[in-house]
Amino acid sequence: MRLLGLDVGSKTVGVAISDPLGITAQELETIKIDESKFSFGMRQIRKLVRKYDVEGFVLGLPKNMDGSSGHSVERSKQYGERLKEKFDLPVHYMDERLTTVQADRILVQEAGVHDRVERKKVIDQMAAVLILQSYLEATRKDK
C-alpha cells in the first residue's frame, strides 16, 4: 500500500512516497502552490497518485509546542479535505512538530548540505519524508 506524505506550507508542498510494502519513505518533489490564486498543486498530485498507484495520504499537522493548533494546522486540515474531495482516498494526519528543524539538521550534519539555498530546495521534501516515516513506524507498531 503506497502512501503520499505531504508537508503543506503556505508556498510549497513537500512530497514523499512510501515503498510498496509501507516500510520506508523517500522524497519525491516539492510542489509550488499559491493560495491567493487557488493553485494547490492538485494536478501534479493527481499525476503522482496515478503513477505510484497511491492509496492514501499522510499530512503533517504543525501543532504549536504546547499542543495547541494554529493557522498552519487549519491550512493542513483544509488541504486534507481538498484531497478527500478530489481523490476519494483516506487522509491521515501526523504530528509534525519540529520536522522542518529536524530536516534542516539532517541536511547539514548528515548530508553535508551547508548552502542555505540548496537546503531550501529540498527541506520540504525531507520534512515530508520524516512525517511519512513517523506514520509508517507508528502504524507498524499498532499491528
Swiss-Prot record:
Membrane-crossing residue ranges in chain numbering: none
GO molecular function, one term: nuclease activity
Keywords assigned: Cytoplasm, Hydrolase, Nuclease, Ribosome biogenesis
Cellular compartment(s): Cytoplasm
Domain of life (superkingdom): Bacteria
One GO process term, biological-process aspect: rRNA 5'-end processing
EC number in record: 3.1.-.-
GO cellular component assignments: cytosol
InterPro entries: RNaseH-like_sf, YqgF, YqgF/RNaseH-like_dom, YqgF/RNaseH-like_dom_sf
Signal sequence residues: none
Pfam families: RuvX
Enzyme class: hydrolase
CDD domains hit by this protein: YqgF (cd16964)
HAMAP family according to UniProt: Nuclease_YqgF
Stated family: Belongs to the YqgF nuclease family.
Annotated function: Could be a nuclease involved in processing of the 5'-end of pre-16S rRNA.
Protein name stated in the entry: Putative pre-16S rRNA nuclease
